[in-house]
Amino acid sequence: MTVVVVTGTDTGVGKTVACAALACHARQAGIEVAVCKPVQTGTQIGDDDLAEVARLSGVTELTGLVRYPQPLAPAAAAEHAGMALPTREQLLELIAGLDRPGRLILVEGAGGLLVELADASATLRDLAVELGALALVTVSVELGTLNHTALTLEALTTRGVACAGLVIGSWTGRPGAVQISNRSALARLAPMRATLPAGAGSMDATDFAAMSAAAFDRDWVTTLVH
């Protein structure tokens, strides 16, 4: 089973767009792709990451498990709604059920790597450990990103989860000294797999497909599937 968990150093750094871009690139490379967003919050304000991935990437194999109305961390959103978090076993079974020969499974978390997604404080990192998954980390280029990224990479390393690389979720067309410096420093922490333009999530499907095709190295993407 080939699983890549897509996480981020913070909320709002572009995980969903990064997930959609990788899914779109892989689809265009002839790889069968499934995208899983086990836990979705914020449905009452229209948050629907799987719908966004579908619109941008053209991938049709999309799977989720639980949806909470409030735009809060999953544990808080579940409590607010009077609902339970899923169990770790439910999440693992959901993801394992997507396995097919030659298929790439992308699993998008909620918030950062160590946000509780299931009961008993299970996190995306825990799922990655049990699935033998790689982790693709979506990052910012603003102040604070170097510490946030280093902490995320350290959290992966301590549990033996291999980092597939970094994706800059939003790169402005007119970067300043901070953004340029941080981009160079981030590339020294882990392989930089893609730099996505600011506003990519607002592109139509045709423009997004062209952007995604150019953003990632196809040879690297094809090595993900085994």
Curated annotation (Swiss-Prot):
GO terms for biological process: biotin biosynthetic process. Its EC number is 6.3.3.3. Mg(2+) binds at residues 16, 49, 108. Substrate binds at residue 41. Pfam families: AAA_26. Its cofactor is Mg(2+). Pathway: Cofactor biosynthesis; biotin biosynthesis; biotin from 7,8-diaminononanoate: step 1/2. It comes from the Bacteria. CDD domains: DTBS. ATP binds at residues 12-17, 49, 108-111, 169-170, 197-199. It is found in: Cytoplasm. It catalyses: (7R,8S)-7,8-diammoniononanoate + CO2 + ATP = (4R,5S)-dethiobiotin + ADP + phosphate + 3 H(+). The keyword Signal does not apply. Catalyzes a mechanistically unusual reaction, the ATP-dependent insertion of CO2 between the N7 and N8 nitrogen atoms of 7,8-diaminopelargonic acid (DAPA, also called 7,8-diammoniononanoate) to form a ureido ring. This is ATP-dependent dethiobiotin synthetase BioD.
